[in-house]
Amino acid sequence: MLSVLDTFTGFTGLLNERWKRDLSDLIYYYKQERFHIVRLNSLVYYLGDMAWIPPIRIPQDYAQLTAQEMADLMERILREGNYTTLVLDIGDYGRDTLPLLEKCQVVYAPIREDPFSAEKMREFEEYLETTGNNAVAEKIQKIHVPMVTGGRRMEHFPQELLWGDMGDFVRSLLKGQRNLWDN
């Protein structure tokens, strides 16, 4: 399962799809205390065997939930959706990601080998140490993510994403790991 939390993912064009519902709808139901499994299932789309929720279209919708509320929502998705693994891109929460990261058993941090990226990671690790979040720091696994090229024919992009280098990479990370979200 995949919940993509990214401001502008490009998936609409790459997948040639305009979704009627997305993560914004789920956030709305959650805030109205109307979240339940039927609503969740009405928002889930499938790409092969991967269940996913289309990302927010309007970035301001991220402000509707605190990071703690988003962590609670993700827990409900796992519990009520009967999922064992949840993959998140939490970049839009910035330093407010701690409530989300504290819930995770593993935090994969994509890194690059340039000085700017190395300094950003160093600052984040320093922040974790300064704020006493050593438990989160211990969960971080730095990874080098393969480039998604999309191939020559964009109509095959979904299959290439799942079964190409990126899909192989993610499957190898998750192989044998279940219940990656702490209870």
Can you describe what each PLM-predicted range is?
Residues 24-27, 41-42, 71, 75, ...:
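Generic detector of well-ordered alpha-helical segments enriched in charged/polar residues
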